[in-house]
UniProtKB/Swiss-Prot annotation:
Residues 1-32, 105-124 are annotated as: Disordered. GO terms for biological process: translation. The modification 3-methylthioaspartic acid is found at D89. With S4 and S5 plays an important role in translational accuracy. Part of the 30S ribosomal subunit. Contacts proteins S8 and S17. May interact with IF1 in the 30S initiation complex. It comes from Beutenbergia cavernae (strain ATCC BAA-8 / DSM 12333 / CCUG 43141 / JCM 11478 / NBRC 16432 / NCIMB 13614 / HKI 0122). It comes from the Bacteria. Belongs to the universal ribosomal protein uS12 family. Keywords: Methylation, Ribonucleoprotein, Ribosomal protein, RNA-binding, rRNA-binding, tRNA-binding. This is Small ribosomal subunit protein uS12. PANTHER family: 30S RIBOSOMAL PROTEIN S12 FAMILY MEMBER (PTHR11652).
Length: 124
C-alpha cells in the first residue's frame, strides 16, 4: 500500500478498459465488403449451420460477422453494415451484419421484431 506522500507524487493509475469490438474503432457501425460468405457449426451442446461472412471493414480490418435471420442475399463483394454484438456459440464471431442496410435485404415475411431484421410491414 502506498504512503500518502507517494500518492501525492504519483497518484493512482486508471485501469484501461479493453473494448469488445476493436475493429469498429469506437464507431457504432462500420461499412465493409464481404470477402467470403459461408456456414459454420456452433460450439458443443448446440448443432446447426450458422451463416457467417468474412468482412473487410472501412477500418482496414477483416472480421467474421454473423448474418442474423432466416435466409439472406449476401455474396462475395456485397457491401454490408457491421455492428457489434457477439454470437455466444460461435467462437471468434464478435460482430453482426445489420439487416435491411446497404446491400443486405431484410427478412421476408417477418411479423415480429421487424425493426431488428429490416423487414417492412406486410400489406393486408
Amino acid at each position: 500500500m502506498p504512503t500518502i506522500q507517494q500518492l501525492v507524487r504519483k497518484g493512482r493509475k486508471d485501469k484501461a478498459t479493453k473494448t469488445k469490438t476493436p475493429a469498429l474503432k469506437g464507431s457504432p457501425q462500420r461499412r465493409g465488403v464481404c470477402t467470403r460468405v459461408y456456414t459454420t457449426t456452433p460450439r458443443k451442446p448446440n448443432s446447426a449451420l450458422r451463416k457467417v461472412a468474412r468482412v473487410k471493414l472501412s477500418s482496414q480490418m477483416e472480421v467474421t460477422a454473423y448474418i442474423p435471420g432466416v435466409g439472406h442475399n449476401l455474396q462475395e463483394h456485397s457491401i454490408v453494415l457491421v455492428r457489434g454484438g457477439r454470437v455466444a456459440d460461435l467462437p471468434g464471431v464478435r460482430y453482426k451484419i445489420v439487416r435491411g442496410a446497404l446491400d443486405t435485404q431484410g427478412v421476408r415475411g417477418r411479423q415480429q421484431a421487424r425493426s431488428r431484421y429490416g423487414a417492412k410491414k406486410e400489406k393486408k
